[in-house]
Amino acid sequence: MSRIAKQPIVIPSDVSITLIGQMVIVKGSKGELKRLIHDSVLVKSVKSCLVFSSRINSSVKGWAQAGTARSLVNSMIHGVTVGFFKKLKLFGVGYRISINSSKNLNMSLGYSHIIEYVLPFGIFVESISQAEIIVKGINKQLVGQVAANLRAYRKSEPYKGKGIRYSNEIVRVKEAKKK
């Protein structure tokens, strides 16, 4: 049995949750998110709490899905109230990132051309400097995926430490080959 699924989610006063079959719709001050919950999970709204359980009590997979569903809905509630962000930093001579007028990113990462990245709907980027950006949004998965996609254009390499990395990421620089 999942310990996470047994914990109820307390619904904040500024969030409204609608349950339509297996669809959970969460509305808050920052926006609205929808998610389809697995068929083996039963979601109930009791007072100002959401309770998750397995439809078949003896099913281990049902309880595992209930724990996953609870975590996903909890992230949705956090997203529509506070939001999520990932901070990225660029390390390297001449590496720059800028936001153009159509809210797309232009990245100069040492290639012979400038990379233009089109932001998906619901993702916002804030530029702190030419070498730092913050990816923001209400969908945790989408914010993480966009940050990972941006990082994939030039991952930090271990010899000089050049590339794009998360603000809390530590890159261990290797020693150069000796003669």
From Swiss-Prot:
Cross-referenced InterPro entries: Ribosomal_uL6-like, Ribosomal_uL6-like_a/b-dom_sf, Ribosomal_uL6_a/b-dom, Ribosomal_uL6_bac-type, Ribosomal_uL6_CS
Domain of life (superkingdom): Bacteria
SUPFAM superfamilies (UniProt xref): Ribosomal protein L6
Positions of transmembrane segments: none
A cellular component term, taken from the record's GO annotations: cytosolic large ribosomal subunit
Pfam families the record matches: Ribosomal_L6 (PF00347)
Intrachain S-S bonds: none
Record's keyword terms, sorted: Ribonucleoprotein, Ribosomal protein, RNA-binding, rRNA-binding
Gene Ontology molecular functions: rRNA binding; structural constituent of ribosome
GO biological process, alphabetically ordered: cytoplasmic translation
Keyword DNA-binding tagged: no
Signal peptide range in chain numbering: none
Quaternary assembly: Part of the 50S ribosomal subunit.
Family, as annotated: Belongs to the universal ribosomal protein uL6 family.
Function: This protein binds to the 23S rRNA, and is important in its secondary structure. It is located near the subunit interface in the base of the L7/L12 stalk, and near the tRNA binding site of the peptidyltransferase center.
Protein name in the entry: Large ribosomal subunit protein uL6
Natural source organism: Buchnera aphidicola subsp. Baizongia pistaciae (strain Bp)
